[in-house]
Amino acid sequence: MSSFEKVVVIDGKGHLLGRLASIVSKQILNGQKVVVVRCEELNISGEFFRNKLKYHDYLRKATRYNKKKGPFHFRAPSRILYKAIRGMIPHKTARGKAALERLKVFEGVPPPYDKKKRVVVPQALRVLRLKPGRKYTTVGKLSSAVGWKYESVVEKLEEKRKVQSAEYYAKKKALTKKLNAAKASTAESEAAQKLAAFGY
């Protein structure tokens, strides 16, 4: 992610939450617009039960005399990532607020990002960062266990999107094959005409 682009769309699947948050926070502070999709597929190192206990401990933290005064505990995976990123930038300053304006986070892959090229961040990928065999937790599963209600809805929409995506890819593949065949035949006919002009 060193090159500056108009908007970078990151596929969150298989990335470690904290590592991705640190990289994204640096990029948005530098002026890069970033969109993170499939936040429910983000990973946290450590087994599920341990992470659930940690989250319940975090849920206990509240203003003693009035819980409505915060701190507010987000349950949705996209908001968990958002809060992790927010904690890594000076969000109370004008510069930090402007940086957060450049960030968008989503569960699933909503339009128009389903038609955009998605990238991964190798420095934050679980398979490259955690030792093989280490336990990890999916943020979607953790969120669902602590009160997020839309896991089934997101799963249904994702299945629908994957079917449409597979159909689109098959059509594109067939069209590319046809185009390449047409180009090859045109090149052959042009070569034949030139040879005929020289009497071959």
Swiss-Prot record:
Which family, according to UniProt?
Belongs to the universal ribosomal protein uL13 family.
PANTHER family in the record, alphabetically?
LARGE RIBOSOMAL SUBUNIT PROTEIN UL13, RIBOSOMAL PROTEIN L13
| Official protein name in the record | Large ribosomal subunit protein uL13
Sum up the protein's function in the record's words.
Component of the ribosome, a large ribonucleoprotein complex responsible for the synthesis of proteins in the cell. The small ribosomal subunit (SSU) binds messenger RNAs (mRNAs) and translates the encoded message by selecting cognate aminoacyl-transfer RNA (tRNA) molecules. The large subunit (LSU) contains the ribosomal catalytic site termed the peptidyl transferase center (PTC), which catalyzes the formation of peptide bonds, thereby polymerizing the amino acids delivered by tRNAs into a polypeptide chain.
Q: Name one GO cellular component term.
A: ribosome
Extract one GO BP annotation from the record: filamentous growth of a population of unicellular organisms in response to biotic stimulus
Kindly list the GO molecular function terms attached to this UniProt entry. mRNA binding; structural constituent of ribosome
- Assembly and binders: Component of the large ribosomal subunit. Mature ribosomes consist of a small (40S) and a large (60S) subunit. The 40S subunit contains about 32 different proteins and 1 molecule of RNA (18S). The 60S subunit contains 45 different proteins and 3 molecules of RNA (25S, 5.8S and 5S).
Alphabetically sorted, this entry's keywords are:
Cytoplasm, Ribonucleoprotein, Ribosomal protein
